[in-house]
Structure formats: C-alpha cells, structure tokens
C-alpha cells in the first residue's frame, strides 16, 4: 500500500504528523481519493501524497520529501530579541556534528494564535512579540500534543514562561518538556545544570511517566557531582525533595 520508505517505526509518527498538518477532514478525503483511484492498480508513495495534496490544496509531496529524503530531524529554537520572536531550525545532533544545511517543512503546532502553522525556511522572524503575547494566554509552546517529529528549544524569557506554568500542564506536555531538555543537554546545546530548574518545578508530580523521566535525569546527574562539594549537598537535597512527595503519597 505505502512506499517501503515509511513502513517502519518512524513512519507512523510521520503519518500522524501529516494528518494533523492537513486536518482530519482533508486527510480522510485524501485517503478516499487515493483508494478509489488505485483500487485496481499498483501504487507508489507519491500517489498517496498526490491524493492528499488534491484533497487539502497543500504541497504534501514537498512536506513528506523533507522528512523522508534526508536523514535526521530538526531542533526548532525560539527566542525573543528586540521584541521580535525568532524561530529557527537546524539539524539536531548528539555527538559529532556534520552540518549539511538541511531544512524541513516543520509544522509548528503552536498553542498561540498569530503564529504561522508551518516553518519552511531556516529562520522566521515575527515582529511585535509583546503584542502577540498580550493577545494570547499562557506560555508560548510549539509541537503541542507532541505529534511532530522535532525538538523544541525555548530560550530566555520563553523558557522562563514555560517553567512558570510547568507544574500546571498536562502530563504529556510535562513529559515533552523534560525529554526535550534532556536531549538538548545530551547534545551539548544546553548544560546539564540547566535541567535543575525543570526538576525543581516537578517535585510534586504524580504521573508515573513524568516521575520516571525525571528520576532517570537525576540518576544521570550523579555522574557530574563531585563528593564533598556544595553541589553534592544541593543535589542530595533536590533528590530528597523530589522523592519525598511520592513516598508520602504512597
């Protein structure tokens, strides 16, 4: 039915990402067109993209080619400079970097109005951030529901806003923030020390998945703590605080 290039673990996530980018109605309509047109014939992957493009009016082939025809996936960073929201994509690396200038068609899936739904260039600049913020509620987030195949890197005041409301987010969003910050630390884009403010906001977390993810980070941080130092004392205090809530709850 589908091109072999997407029949593996990554494939289901990409199709879910595509479905959300197009919308359920257009996705269903495109599948209907595809099955009716090819019910008695062989197909290739582009036949499906053509049908979905016909139904949605969007360039589905270009969207999917950016994800299927090149390796890796992007990290999308967001920062505010001189009241301008700057959104930038680059390839995400853990370990040795070999920048190739790759770009993806990235569904931003923001929780704010006034944000484009897609990032197609390396950099997108949106002026008058203060007005944009005033017109929306809550911290700006991308890849809501974690349906797209990229990592978000919030910087400066954007990260501060997310941390301020982290404890009140749903479990999926909390887990997403924790996992993204951990991956950014593993890639060297942020320090492991910058994970501590995230953990401190989740000391009364009861979700098993979130608690497990944070516990894994805490265990890994122990490798960077020198014995007999103030850092070790602070680390042990955080460890006790984090575990105490769930110990008493149980």
Q: Which residues does each PLM region occupy?
A:
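Non-catalytic accessory/interaction domains
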Residues: 1-6, 11-17, 24-28, 36-250
């Amino acid at each position: 039915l589908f091109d072999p290039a997407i029949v593996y673990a990554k494939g289901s996530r990409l199709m879910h990402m595509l479905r959300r980018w197009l919308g359920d109605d257009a996705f269903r309509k495109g599948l209907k067109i595809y099955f009716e047109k090819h019910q008695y014939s062989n197909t290739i992957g582009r036949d499906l993209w053509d049908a979905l493009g016909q139904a949605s009016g969007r360039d589905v082939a270009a969207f999917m080619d950016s994800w299927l025809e090149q390796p890796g996936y992007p990290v999308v960073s967001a920062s505010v400079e001189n009241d301008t929201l700057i959104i930038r994509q680059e390839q995400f690396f853990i370990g040795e970097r070999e920048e190739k200038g790759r770009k993806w068609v990235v569904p931003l899936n923001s929780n704010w109005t006034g944000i484009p739904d897609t990032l197609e260039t390396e950099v997108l600049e949106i002026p008058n951030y203060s007005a944009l913020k005033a017109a929306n509620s809550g911290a700006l987030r991308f890849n809501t529901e974690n349906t797209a195949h990229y990592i978000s890197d919030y910087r400066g005041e954007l990260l501060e806003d997310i941390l301020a409301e982290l404890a009140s987010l749903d479990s999926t969003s909390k887990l997403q923030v924790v996992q993204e910050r951990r991956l950014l630390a593993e890639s060297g884009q942020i320090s492991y020390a910058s994970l501590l403010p995230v953990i401190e906001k989740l000391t009364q977390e009861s979700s098993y998945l979130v608690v497990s993810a944070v516990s894994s980070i805490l265990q890994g941080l122990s490798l960077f703590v020198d014995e007999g130092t103030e850092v070790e004392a602070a680390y042990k205090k955080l460890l006790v605080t984090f575990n105490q809530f769930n110990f008493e709850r149980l």
